[in-house]
Amino acid sequence: MSAPIISFKNFSFQYNSQTEPTLRDINLDIYPGEKVLIAGPSGSGKSTLGRCLNGLIPQSYPGTVTGQARIAGQTITESSIFALSQDVGTVLQDPDSQFVGLTVVEDMAFSLENDQQTQPAMRQATEQWAQTLDLQDLLTHRPQELSGGQKQRVAMAGVLIDNSKILLFDEPLASLDPASGKASMALIDQLTHTQDLTVIIIEHRIEDVLQQPIDRLIVMQDGAIVANDRPETILRQSLMTQLGLREPLYLSALKLAGVDLATCQHLDNLQALQVPDLTATLQNWTTGVQLQSPTVHDQPLLAIEHLTFGYDPAKPIINDITVTLHQGEMISLVGQNGTGKSTLSNLITGFLMPQSGKMRFNGHSLADQSVKERADQIGYILQDPNQMISTTMIFDEVAAGLVLRGVADDEVKRRVQAVLKVCGLYEFRHWPISALSFGQKKRVTIAAILVLEPAMLILDEPTAGQDLQHYTEMMTFLTKINQEQHMTIMLITHDMHLMLEYTDRTIVLGHGNILMDARPADVLTNASIIQQASLAKTSLYTLAEAHHLNPTEFVAKFVQAEREAR
């Protein structure tokens, strides 16, 4: 066996600003050509380990290092970020934050210009990588104009063009719709083999990453590595939920049906999965589950009639949409990036005004209501928390809306503390917001709206950046207020797990119109809609098809059984 290209020996790291180590006694070897997934709950040390891999620690994030870490023969404490960047290319969670060129081709060539390469050499390299990454038609575009998947390919080109042999991805699926995420994983797998790369993926969406083969799954918890093995071995041991991670849907379905995972072969690859008598087992389980009648919501809350809007009136993003949301519904709004999901939300909340159409809330026209007046009834939580935060301290941020509305100090304290506990932020209530991770900031903005107790909530990608524990806590809380207060909640999401687990109605946007309005199980088993809306077949759909079950019935019964178990 060849020598490891990455090696940590008894390695620990403590930030200067912290009183305890963030990484504890890390022992890890990664070999050339391996594709490794690093997973773990928020605060487990994944991001810190990533910063060690690309040299940001200890150069940009000073602290105390014990033990040894070597990357491609270089000791991280003795190497510069520049030296390590020659071997390690990093693709960030938000590609926009690493673009430096005005056009795609300029961004691709940036590192070559720094290396003082000749124009013919730069032209040859950019043409080669543009072809490899399917960017030929985008070279003159601004990176900011591109879709999420295209932006990610540009970011990859910018680091691969310098012949980096180690590629580090920080949550590559966070901003992608399901279809783009599936394509991204396929591209990464292809590059691993064709370019002889060593790939490290930091991601908590394990099922989506496992759509392509992974050599090893490394799970972190409390700054330590608690599992390091083949994905199949870890899945068979049912360690996922114990370690704060979401297990694949098909694995949950097998367990619900009473399958002994010890009898399963190729458990990490649904296409190759082998289980004795699995078809009969699944059919028997499906027959034994009786679907309950869904709850009927018949009191209109938000009525939208013939709504049309376009930044260019000749090219409407929202085109003659008519839909009614009822009191007490929990709704998922889905569709390909750029289809108008956020635009529709901005129209509802008054940040944009429609070219035509009407909206009524609780029987009253929204046409003459200001943004503030609408905000008293409709809470809107943006995808990027940094666009909402207006104070420096967590408690003050959550309390701001109540203070502006003249709520008494004692009541402010009571309501803020209650919401902070539900959102998992109570212990941080006196912290500055700048000390929080992206996911923690997200929870602060959700808390700041929930504390106002509006009649309707719109949440844009509410679970982005959340680990399983905080995802479950947040969605359990939203479900509770939905059921107990009959609050209408609309979730703009790419998370198909969320659609199935927590919503009873899915509205699919595409081409300016509503493509489908139905139960999540109906949407996610409709092949035509999946393709049009850039969704992806869930593993439940694939499992049902492979064993001659009605996919819609199977998915609906799985969802019901999961909710009953929860």
UniProtKB/Swiss-Prot annotation:
Probably part of an ABC transporter complex. Responsible for energy coupling to the transport system. Coiled coil: none annotated. It is an enzyme of class 7 (translocase). Its main location: membrane. It is found in: Cell membrane. It is a peripheral membrane protein. The lineage of its organism: Bacteria, Bacillati, Bacillota, Bacilli, Lactobacillales. One of its GO terms (molecular function) is ATP hydrolysis activity. ATP binds at residues 40-47, 335-342. This is Putative ABC transporter ATP-binding protein lp_0149. Its EC number is 7.-.-.-. Residues 6-247, 302-536 form the ABC transporter domain. InterPro entries: AAA+_ATPase (IPR003593), ABC_Co_transporter (IPR022216), ABC_transporter-like_ATP-bd (IPR003439), ABC_transporter-like_CS (IPR017871), ABC_transpr_CbiO/EcfA_su (IPR015856), ECF_ABC_transporter_ATP-bd (IPR050095), P-loop_NTPase (IPR027417). GO terms for cellular component: ATP-binding cassette (ABC) transporter complex. It comes from Lactiplantibacillus plantarum (strain ATCC BAA-793 / NCIMB 8826 / WCFS1). Keywords: ATP-binding, Cell membrane, Membrane, Nucleotide-binding, Repeat, Translocase, Transport. Belongs to the ABC transporter superfamily. It holds the Pfam family ABC_tran.
